[in-house]
Amino acid sequence: MYDISKWKHVFKLDPNKEISDEHLEMICESGTDAVIVGGSDGVTIDNVLHMLVSIRRYAVPCVLEVSNVEAITPGFDFYYIPSVLNSRKVEWLTGVHHEALKEFGDIMNWDEIFMEGYCVLNPEAKVAQLTEAKCDLTEDDVIAYARMADKLLHLPIFYLEYSGTYGDVELVKKVKAELQQAKLYYGGGISNVKEAKEVAQYADTVVVGNVIYENIKAALQTVKAVKGE
């Protein structure tokens, strides 16, 4: 079994976006610690299955980040269930989770399932609009969400999500200092080695996504930048 607490770098693939077989092979053979499959919209059982079958040709660990209960399928190593802590809609805090447990609770392997406490910080991002996230947060607001995830809810992952834009590294540093047991995931706007290294100083796990579709070479370079190998 893989140990997610040791993952430093992961790629995130959107099942609703096209990626060539050649680029997928590069991603899966890059030395990244895992590949997360997930997106904010257009996630279906068909495109999730297509992505799963494609990734399973390689040895890399594979995670489904659940945003649509109807797109859940067996075959992934782990399942990440996001709870958007700064969402104004209860369905993104506990609603989707309740639905999933009603449908799959009897057959869930709890060793494969991890909750993520998301704090979404880019109001322009699809995920912010979908979840109606309150993004105009102060530093104290964000730290309070981090403490909530870590100390009140005892979540294994606190995820700072800037989705499409590069975030505030000083804030990442301060959030990391607050967390005792939760691992800090950072996602958003990483497009080069410099940014990847900068964030990796503080985040436990750096998530690289959009740049895969914009500049595959730059995406691949982030692996060594983060892991220092």
Swiss-Prot record:
EC number: 2.5.1.n9
SUPFAM superfamilies linked: FMN-linked oxidoreductases
Residues that, per the record, bind Mg(2+): D14, S40
Cofactor: Mg(2+)
Enzyme kind, highest EC tier: transferase
Key words of the record: Lipid biosynthesis, Lipid metabolism, Magnesium, Metal-binding, Phospholipid biosynthesis, Phospholipid metabolism, Transferase
Molecular function via GO: heptaprenylglyceryl phosphate synthase activity; magnesium ion binding
Superkingdom of the organism of origin: Bacteria
Pathway the protein contributes to: Membrane lipid metabolism; glycerophospholipid metabolism
GO BP term, example: glycerophospholipid biosynthetic process
Catalytic activity: sn-glycerol 1-phosphate + all-trans-heptaprenyl diphosphate = 3-heptaprenyl-sn-glycero-1-phosphate + diphosphate
Keyword 4Fe-4S: no
Positions that bind sn-glycerol 1-phosphate: K12, Y159, L160, E161, Y162, S163, G164, G189, G209, N210
Record note on quaternary structure: Homodimer.
UniProt-listed NCBIfam families: GGGP-family (TIGR01768), PRK04169.1-1 (NF003197), PRK04169.1-3 (NF003199)
Biological function: Prenyltransferase that catalyzes in vivo the transfer of the heptaprenyl moiety of heptaprenyl pyrophosphate (HepPP; 35 carbon atoms) to the C3 hydroxyl of sn-glycerol-1-phosphate (G1P), producing heptaprenylglyceryl phosphate (HepGP). This reaction is an ether-bond-formation step in the biosynthesis of archaea-type G1P-based membrane lipids found in Bacillales.
Similarity section: Belongs to the GGGP/HepGP synthase family. Group I subfamily.
Protein name: Heptaprenylglyceryl phosphate synthase
Lineage: Bacteria, Bacillati, Bacillota, Bacilli, Bacillales
